[in-house]
UniProtKB/Swiss-Prot annotation:
Annotated segments matching region Disordered: 677-698
Entry annotated with the keyword Ubl conjugation: yes
Modification after translation (UniProt): Neddylated. Attachment of NEDD8 is required for the E3 ubiquitin-protein ligase activity of the SCF-like complex.
Cross-linked sites for Glycyl lysine isopeptide (Lys-Gly) (interchain with G-Cter in NEDD8): 712
Subunit structure: Component of multiple BCR (BTB-CUL3-RBX1) E3 ubiquitin-protein ligase complexes formed of cul3, rbx1 and a variable BTB domain-containing protein acting as both, adapter to cullin and substrate recognition subunit. Interacts with btbd6.
Extent of Basic and acidic residues compositional bias: 682-698
Keywords: Cell cycle, Cell division, ER-Golgi transport, Isopeptide bond, Mitosis, Nucleus, Transport, Ubl conjugation
Gene Ontology cellular component list: centrosome; Cul3-RING ubiquitin ligase complex; cytoplasm; mitotic spindle; nucleus; polar microtubule; spindle pole
The protein's name: Cullin-3-B
GO biological process: cell migration; COPII vesicle coating; embryonic cleavage; endoplasmic reticulum to Golgi vesicle-mediated transport; integrin-mediated signaling pathway; mitotic metaphase chromosome alignment; negative regulation of Rho protein signal transduction; positive regulation of mitotic cell cycle phase transition
């Protein structure tokens, strides 16, 4: 020990320094300490540790390490543990291969762990100093490594352990009861022997387990498919997945759940997706046909687990949906009722919306597929825009449909879904304008609110440009009401008489309404013509510089009609006359609601009893097509609307046919609406061609306007880029074909709005 004392001549505090004196241990003494420790370790391994002083053993180990004999202690420990595990433990386990193998191995493993904890406690100082300084495994881990290499991974023990575990799981899968605890203990042991990693568990158990499982499920899938319907197969696969998850939870390491579930999914689902989906009388189509929402939900849930599962389902659903849709919109049978046509599509949409909600969890892929399919088949039939407009027309017309406003609103919302799928929105707009005009002018709208509500839906969908004309029609109706009030006031003030005609005039703005520039001719009878002339003079006096052109095809009239003949049955006996106003013995009075053309024809019969087709044509000057349609309505319609008779009694109207008033006409209704033939069936082919021509003319202007707009802002553009941009701008209204766009570009070049560049004829410049 160093001397202690004060230093003189220094004011610093003195520090005491203690230097350890060198202690040397001779080899003999070291060996005696090691023998003592070795004996103690062996006693612990033999479970004879009750007489040992752990404090003394710790001190001895401490002394060895302190005097730099840590390596001797570490090496000695490894040899003692190895010797015990090879000579005693391994032999015991080998002897138990055919008898209580897992229990023996588990017991040996538990004993070894207990022993290593005690040994670790004795050699704690070595762990802290020697192990740290020399970067070797600590005492406990060293024990694990030796147990792993000398016992668990020893040739036949390793193979037998693997095979035993696999056999037990295979037996359990077949329904036998096995010792789950033994499997769990073995798996936990393999995980611990991996020292923070999974390699031992993975190599010695998991990899072969997954391989065996794949083979098992491969065979099981064949059996399941051969014996079960799609829905039962799906339920069995679900049960199998749950069973495997439950087995992992109780027996294996939790990290095995994901790989084993993937194996089940691959073998039972992925490899057989098409087979399951296309199963005859039980697959996806069968489920869709029979509305099996729960089975579809099970299939969706199962297929969502695997790559391309939902895609496979979607493709199959899409084929079926397109087939159904094509059948609904097929152009066969021209006599299709537009209301039934659209209702059929709405019913189909409702069915698939239900599947989407209840079976497919509102999945985006299914949603997009259904929308794409509806867009595909709805646009296969060129009449779809007209039929949709007629469907809405039917719902917005007055009539006994027994629908509340909320129900009408709901139907219109559904109709708007179909409208979104429609590529030719401009064609729909043209028809909608015609049908709205008819409702407004004949006062047939169920309510202004419903009409405006529908227009606001269209506005939300397509913007105000789309609905500006429709809104203009409403403004015209409002202004016309005011004008008529003023006109009636004028008649009262001036005392001018309209000669018994109750006249209502609607002044329509050209451009808003489906007016015709070349208005069909029609010789209006004198009394209504005289009444209109009085209105014309009144209106033009107020609005100088305006022009009024009568739109005969849009007008209507209420005619007082008197029928004089007795109404007879086929046997000649007379019958009652229902709702007619009877004056005199057989005279019946009705109010006939007719078109302007029908009024002009009927009023001829105030002058003569009979007219031939040619005579009517000459007198009225109505164009032949309109005349034929009007006469068909009056003479060939339902018996309750047949106010004229014709000879011969055929459905066709031809020259030489003779027409007379049907004096036997009767109806239960006092007010009789004469339906225009085929109004509900949509336009005839010539009319449709005419409408299509008008649409094409409008499109030319819209395409040119879009080209000019784009070129004005870009100045210079390549042909394909310009075509793509024009298509993008116009697709909300219609899809212009590249050929038509090219023609319009050429037209603009001719008119010098655009020019080709000299270096590249496919590049255009804007000519200011």
């Amino acid at each position: 020990m160093s001397n202690l004392g004060k230093s003189t001549g220094s004011r610093k505090d003195t520090k005491m320094r203690i230097r350890a004196f060198p202690m040397t241990m001779d080899e003999k003494y070291v060996n005696s300490i090691w023998d003592l420790l070795k004996n103690a370790i062996q006693e612990i391994q033999r479970k004879n540790n009750s007489g040992l002083s752990f404090e003394e053993l710790y001190r001895n180990a401490y002394t060895m390490v302190l005097h730099k004999h840590g390596e001797k202690l570490y090496t000695g420990l490894r040899e003692v543990v190895t010797e015990h595990l090879i000579n005693k433990v391994r032999e015991d386990v080998l002897n138990s291969l055919n008898n209580n193998f897992l229990q023996t191995l588990n017991q040996a493993w538990n004993d070894h762990q207990t022993a290593m904890v005690m040994i670790r406690d004795i050699l704690m100082y070595m762990d802290r100093v020697y192990v740290q300084q020399n970067n070797v495994e600590n005492v406990y881990n060293l024990g694990l490594i030796i147990f792993r290499d000398q016992v668990v991974r020893y040739g036949c023990i390793r193979d037998h352990l693997r095979q035993t575990l696999l056999d037990m799981i295979a037996r359990e899968r077949k329904g036998e009861v096995v010792d789950r605890g033994a499997i769990r203990n073995a798996c936990q042991m393999l995980m611990i022997l991996g020292l923070e990693g999974r390699s031992v568990y993975e190599e010695d158990f998991e990899a072969p387990f997954l391989e065996m499982s794949a083979e098992f499920f491969q065979m099981e899938s064949q059996k399941f498919l051969a014996e079960n319907s799609a829905s039962v197969y799906i339920k069995k696969v679900e049960a199998r997945i749950n069973e495997e998850i439950e087995r992992v939870m109780h027996c294996l390491d939790k990290s095995t759940e994901e790989p084993i579930v993937k194996v089940v999914e691959r073998e039972l689902i992925s490899k057989h997706m098409k087979t399951i989906v296309e199963m005859e009388n039980s697959g996806l189509v069968h489920m869709l046909k029979n509305g099996k929402t729960e089975d579809l939900a099970c299939m969706y849930k199962l297929f969502s687990r695997v790559p391309n599962g939902l895609k496979t389902m979607c493709e199959c659903m899409s084929l079926y949906l397109r087939e159904q849709g094509k059948a609904l919109v097929s152009e066969e049978g021209e006599g299709k009722n537009p209301v039934d046509y659209i209702q059929g599509l709405l019913d189909l949409k409702s069915r698939f919306d239900r599947f989407l909600q209840e079976s497919f969890s509102n999945d985006r892929l299914f949603k997009q597929t259904i929308a794409g399919d509806f867009e595909y088949f709805l646009n296969l039939n060129s009449r779809s825009p007209e039929y949709l407009s007629l469907f809405i027309d039917d719902k917005l017309k007055k009539g006994v449909k027994g629908l509340t406003e909320q129900e009408v609103e709901s139907i219109l919302d559904k109709a708007m879904v179909l409208f979104r799928f429609m590529q030719e929105k401009d064609v729909f707009e043209r028809y909608y304008k015609q049908h709205l005009a008819r409702r407004l002018l004949t006062n047939k709208s169920v309510s202004d609110d419903s009409e405006k509500n529908m227009i606001s839906k269209l506005k939300t969908e397509c913007g105000c440009q789309f609905t500006s004309k429709l809104e203009g029609m409403f403004r015209d109706m409002s202004i016309s009401n005011t004008t008529m009030d003023e006109f009636r006031q004028h008649l009262q003030t001036t005392g001018v008489s309209l000669g018994g005609v109750d006249l209502t005039v609607r002044v329509l703005t050209t451009g808003y309404w489906p007016t015709q520039s070349a208005t069909p001719k029609c010789n209006i009878p004198p009394s209504p013509r005289h009444a209109f002339e009085i209105f014309r003079r009144f209106y033009l006096a107020k609005h100088s510089g305006r022009q009024l052109t009568l739109q005969h095809h849009m007008g209507s009239a209420d005619l007082n009609a008197t029928f004089y003949g007795a109404v007879k049955k086929e046997d000649g006996s007379e019958v009652g006359v229902g709702g007619a106003q009877v004056t005199g013995s057989n005279t019946r009075k009705h109010i006939l609601q007719v078109s302007t053309f029908q009024m002009t024809i009927l009023m001829l019969f105030n002058n003569r009893e009979k007219y031939t087709f040619e005579e009517i044509q000459q007198e009225t000057d109505i164009p032949e097509r309109e005349l034929v349609r009007a006469l068909q309505s009056l003479a060939c319609g339902k018996p309750t609307q047949r106010v004229l008779t014709k000879e011969p009694k055929s459905k066709e109207i031809e020259s030489g046919h003779m027409f007379t008033v049907n004096d036997q006409f009767t109806s239960k209704l006092h007010r009789v609406k004469i339906q225009t033939v085929a109004a509900k069936q949509g336009e005839s082919d010539p009319e449709r061609k005419e409408t299509r021509q008008k649409v094409d003319d409008d499109r030319k202007h819209e395409i040119e306007a879009a080209i000019v707009r784009i070129m004005k802002s870009r100045k210079k553009m390549q042909h394909n880029v310009l075509v793509a941009e024009v298509t993008q701008q116009l697709k909300a209204r219609f899809l212009p074909s590249p050929v038509v766009i090219k023609k319009r570009i050429e037209g603009l070049i001719e008119r010098e709005y655009l020019a080709r560049t000299p270096e590249d004829r496919k590049v255009y410049t804007y000519v200011a």
